[in-house]
């Protein structure tokens, strides 16, 4: 079968550099789980290196042309190709509560959505690695006090240790994207349970950063906090001045306030 044609509406940019594909596959430590799910494998440049490892590899691909290509060229993937949209698919139809890692050269147009979707399965995902638009990868790994630090940074780092590994040039893709890419690795924290309400924590973080230039006293007005609580010194700060632990402590204070 001929090579798959990259489809713009799917955000496809096929990696052609074998050494980079191998490096991405090697970011997984493969401990504590027996299954790996690759999102958006395309023509399998990364897949071949995953299949060589001592884990069971599944792939999920929305592009039917790519699915046909994988089926014809990778016999080891027999019964392990999921022709679905990752953002809508119930992963436990295949993993049934088991632990698995996620990896991929993620489509730029939905990469952030992929991360948020993966967070929903964090109890089953001890490790997550792959390639994003460089700016997105940096945002995920960013620490407090910078413009890039935001919702994605806090919510991911509440549950995972995030590490930016290396930058990838535009020229190693077909077609080349307009921006550089970045590879990162997330490893789930040993204790990743939140000592506060999860739903409220997500709400506090998202609400705070929606008006990131304002102090928390102003950005969190919609939560209807008591006047006494709003006098706490933390409300003089802007959201990018709080690290993950401080957001957790803030959420606990809001809980105690009766929210």
From Swiss-Prot:
HAMAP family membership: 16SrRNA_methyltr_A
Catalytic reaction(s) noted: adenosine(1518)/adenosine(1519) in 16S rRNA + 4 S-adenosyl-L-methionine = N(6)-dimethyladenosine(1518)/N(6)-dimethyladenosine(1519) in 16S rRNA + 4 S-adenosyl-L-homocysteine + 4 H(+)
Similarity remark: Belongs to the class I-like SAM-binding methyltransferase superfamily. rRNA adenine N(6)-methyltransferase family. RsmA subfamily.
Annotated function: Specifically dimethylates two adjacent adenosines (A1518 and A1519) in the loop of a conserved hairpin near the 3'-end of 16S rRNA in the 30S particle. May play a critical role in biogenesis of 30S subunits.
EC assignment: 2.1.1.182
A GO molecular-function descriptor: RNA binding
Binding-site positions, S-adenosyl-L-methionine: 13, 15, 40, 61, 85, 105
Protein name (database record): Ribosomal RNA small subunit methyltransferase A
Keyword set includes Cell division: no
Subcellular location: Cytoplasm
Keyword terms: Cytoplasm, Methyltransferase, RNA-binding, rRNA processing, S-adenosyl-L-methionine, Transferase
SMART domains: rADc
GO cellular component entries: cytosol
């Amino acid at each position: 079968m001929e090579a798959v044609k990259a489809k713009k509406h799917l955000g496809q940019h096929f990696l052609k550099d074998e050494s980079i594909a191998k490096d991405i596959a090697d970011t997984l430590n493969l401990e504590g789980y027996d299954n790996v799910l690759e999102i958006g494998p395309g023509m399998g440049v990364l897949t071949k290196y995953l299949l060589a490892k001592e884990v069971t590899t599944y792939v999920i691909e929305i592009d039917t042309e790519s699915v046909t290509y994988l089926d014809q060229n990778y016999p080891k993937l027999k019964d392990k190709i999921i022709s679905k949209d990752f953002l809508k698919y119930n992963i436990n139809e295949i993993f049934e509560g088991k632990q698995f890692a996620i990896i991929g050269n993620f489509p730029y147009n939905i990469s952030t959505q992929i991360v948020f979707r993966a967070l929903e399965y964090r109890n089953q995902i001890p490790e997550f690695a792959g390639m994003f638009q460089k700016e997105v990868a940096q945002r995920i790994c960013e620490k407090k006090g910078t413009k890039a630090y935001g919702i994605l940074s806090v919510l991911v780092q509440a549950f995972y240790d995030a590490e930016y590994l290396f930058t990838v040039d535009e020229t190693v893709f077909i077609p080349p994207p307009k921006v550089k890419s970045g590879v990162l690795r997330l490893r789930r924290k040993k204790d990743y349970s939140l000592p506060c309400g999860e739903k409220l924590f997500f709400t506090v973080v998202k609400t705070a950063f929606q008006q990131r230039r304002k102090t928390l006293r102003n950005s969190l007005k919609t939560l209807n906090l008591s006047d006494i609580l709003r006098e706490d010194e933390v409300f003089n700060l802007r959201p990018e001045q709080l690290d993950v632990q401080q957001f957790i402590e803030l959420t606990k204070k809001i809980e105690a306030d009766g929210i």
